[in-house]
Amino acid sequence: MNEQKVNVDFGGRTITIATGKMAKQASGAVMVSCGETMVLVTAVALKSAKEGQDFFPLTVNYQEKAYAGGKIPGGFFKREGRPTENETLTCRFIDRPIRPLFPENFLNDTQIMATVVSADQDNDPGILAMIGASAALEVSDIPFFGPIAGVKVGRVDGKFICNPTAEQLAASDLEVVVAASRDAVIMVEGGAAEISEADLLEAIFFGHASVQPIIDAQIELRKQAGVPKREIAPPAVDEALGAKVKELAYAQMKDAVRIRSKQERHNRISAIADETVAALEADFSGRGAEIKDFLDGFEYELVREHILKDGERIDGRDTKTIRPITSEVGILPRVHGSALFTRGETQALVAATLGTSSDEQRIDSLYGESRKRFMLHYNFPPFSVGETSFRLAPGRREIGHGYLAERALERVLPKHDDFPYTIRIVSDILESNGSSSMASVCGGALSMMDAGVPISAPVAGIAMGLIKEGDDIAILSDILGDEDHLGDMDFKVAGTSTGVTAIQMDIKITGVTREIMGKALEQAKEGRLHILGKMAEALAAPRTDLSPYAPRITTIWVKTDKIRDVIGAGGKNVRGITEATGVSIDIEDTGKINIASTNKEACDKAIKMIRDLTAEAEEGKLYMGTVRKVMDFGAFVEIFPGTDGLVHISELDTERVKDVTDILKEGDKVLVKCIGIDKQGKIKLSRKEALGAVLPE
């Protein structure tokens, strides 16, 4: 097949989607280009599902090749290794909008691989990879209810921007990724600087409108180069078995789904399943999986019906009520800041740690090295849901949840010049029954306030849900885990009392209109304000003092030409200061020096040593110096470390001096006065004019 391509204008730039030239043995393959950024995306699905497969095994991989940016990987092996955090997050951005668009009964192993093969500084390869995933599926024989496309939305000076550059993003008050189909928004994720719900809604639908040309281009490419889709047989449903399961278990399931305790409810539903399978073993041997599928369908139907018709949820709440909330701070005595945030059966233990610039995370990417001073790490141990598992590194879900909570909090952080600390937050989920990432936001804000971080405002998060059957709609505040699983939308919103700082939305159905989203955002705001009020009962504002175990950072400035004097040859001077005082010192090219220590006296001593190294003599001032060298014509006196001045023999005493050694010897301490500095910077000192004077403290 010859190469086929389509070009489309996208936010003032041209995107090209091409197929038929590379990776032709994949089910579908496209090269998506914009500027000098190029991403190869392939889609492959096995010809049949594995025997006994009961879920859709979709895998998405995204990799940024070092050569794409003209770099050679670091490390001993000099090749790409485990995925970076950015690669993991991009995998999730690609996975989430396409996963709901495969047929329910398509269970073949499917893999999407996106490889960045060329990268410039202006065009986001992650967005191109998302577009490429949809396009590769469109031209393949894999059944897929697409196409979809993604866009990053920013706003500068009140104007929305499609796929902003790095420079524009730096000035933008929001950064939101929107994935959408022709008719619907499917996924939203991003952060914002406390913007209003109305502005956020505008941004989402600006994104939806922006992707339409990309969707048109994919449809055109499919016409040019697509192959027929595979025929997928509709799932066989045994009506007789279904009727028998309903007869035995439907009434029991109706009672079970109203049990309010998560563990008791799950245990009861599991027991009903076991009893039903056992009861039907004689007539329907080996059909346990099908029986459980029917029971899952009953649960789905009963929970949704109860909410829509009766307005009552699984745990007895109405649609707007938030679960009981308790917050405690300062519960870990040696930790710089800590909080225990509990909402219903979801609980997060959150710790904040303050560090110096040496603790910043260094990130090596295609675009060079960057540093990160704020980190939030989210951990989801198996005991939080009463399970066991073998845990090594954090999974994609943990990285994604941590990133969302991090974005929610980073907009309220103080400026680095005002609070020069590196901040690490760790959220350990101790119990989980819905919205644990939003519990991490609440606990994260409280832990920072407990640590004395002067955040501009407290932040709270809430997870919203949606049940929709035809025109019947229920928007749910503070959803449970089961409501997330059985509902049509998972909508997480975090923010302050003023506005939204982060959002994550995944929609599983079509027909979620702008009006529904607007209502969900307003209902989320009501819930967020309620949660903020509950948090304020534990701690309303940041503490004014840091923990005694946190480092105190003092900032001083020196002239840039004095930086080398502070560092010394081979780092001798700065190393000597740290060894003598035990402090941590960070020196910036601007002349800014941060001194960190838990001991104030050590910090003061280090500051004095730095001041001595960088001090400059001033005419008319007195100095206590040390005689370093005696000559026939006078003595050289060190008034600062490394800074000498000459006391001429005529300036030693009021009387005539025949021999310098009659007055001074090497190593003597002597009070001198600066009487002049010549054009070459040579310092003239006088002992004579300092006689009888007292050095001010």
UniProtKB/Swiss-Prot annotation:
Named cofactor requirement(s): Mg(2+)
Q: Is Plastid one of the keywords UniProt gives this record?
A: no
According to the UniProt entry, its GO molecular function terms are: 3'-5'-RNA exonuclease activity; magnesium ion binding; polyribonucleotide nucleotidyltransferase activity; RNA binding
- Please give a single GO biological process term from the UniProt record: RNA processing
Its recorded reaction(s) are:
RNA(n+1) + phosphate = RNA(n) + a ribonucleoside 5'-diphosphate
Which InterPro entries does the entry mention?
A: ExoRNase_PH_dom1 (IPR001247), ExoRNase_PH_dom2 (IPR015847), ExoRNase_PH_dom2_sf (IPR036345), KH_dom (IPR004087), KH_dom_type_1 (IPR004088), KH_dom_type_1_sf (IPR036612), NA-bd_OB-fold (IPR012340), PNPase (IPR012162)
Domain named KH: which ranges? 551-610
Q: Where in the cell is it found?
A: Cytoplasm
Which EC number(s) are documented for this chain? 2.7.7.8
Which keywords does the record carry?
Cytoplasm, Magnesium, Metal-binding, Nucleotidyltransferase, RNA-binding, Transferase
Q: Any keyword 4Fe-4S? A: no
Instruction: Domain (S1 motif): give its ranges.
Output: 620-688
State the function annotated in the UniProt record: Involved in mRNA degradation. Catalyzes the phosphorolysis of single-stranded polyribonucleotides processively in the 3'- to 5'-direction.
This protein's name: Polyribonucleotide nucleotidyltransferase
